[in-house]
Amino acid sequence: MSKTLSFKTYSAKPGEVERAWYVIDAENQVLGRLAAQVATVLRGKHKPQFTPHVDTGDFVVVTNAGKIALSGKKHDDKTYFSHSHYPGGAKFEQAKDLLQKKPEKVIEHAVWGMLPHNNLGRQLFKKLKVYAGPEHPHAAQMPVEMKVNQ
């Protein structure tokens, strides 16, 4: 931004955005609350230079996805739908089964539902990295640990 006082609305440019890396431990975190905070950081709404049509967000690494908490009876009742695009290709999977097979998909599905469903949303979603265990290969980026608001 310029050093003089200006009363014009600031609009971020893609080249000016500085990106940080955050790591979030999902162990015993409620899925919806975690996904909402992750989506906010991915969009960049926590920054003062947030611009709705520009990717101003940061990278987020979520670890321990297999130890996420679902409130209420969602562990047994929640179902995930997918379709193979062939007749009779509908597939329904319970949350408890998906948490055992692919725990990353549960968090990715929740976060994707909170991002815009357009080109910008797809670009934002690529900055989300989810891992089932406590280890991740992004130590070189020096991610800062972030706590989830309860």
Curated annotation (Swiss-Prot):
Pfam annotation, one family: Ribosomal_L13
GO biological process: negative regulation of translation; translation
Keywords: Ribonucleoprotein, Ribosomal protein
GO molecular function annotation: mRNA binding; structural constituent of ribosome
Cellular component terms (Gene Ontology): cytosolic large ribosomal subunit
Superkingdom, taxonomy of origin: Bacteria
Assembly notes: Part of the 50S ribosomal subunit.
Family: Belongs to the universal ribosomal protein uL13 family.
Known role: This protein is one of the early assembly proteins of the 50S ribosomal subunit, although it is not seen to bind rRNA by itself. It is important during the early stages of 50S assembly.
Name this protein carries in UniProt: Large ribosomal subunit protein uL13
Annotated organism of origin: Chlorobaculum parvum (strain DSM 263 / NCIMB 8327)
Gene assigned in the entry: rplM
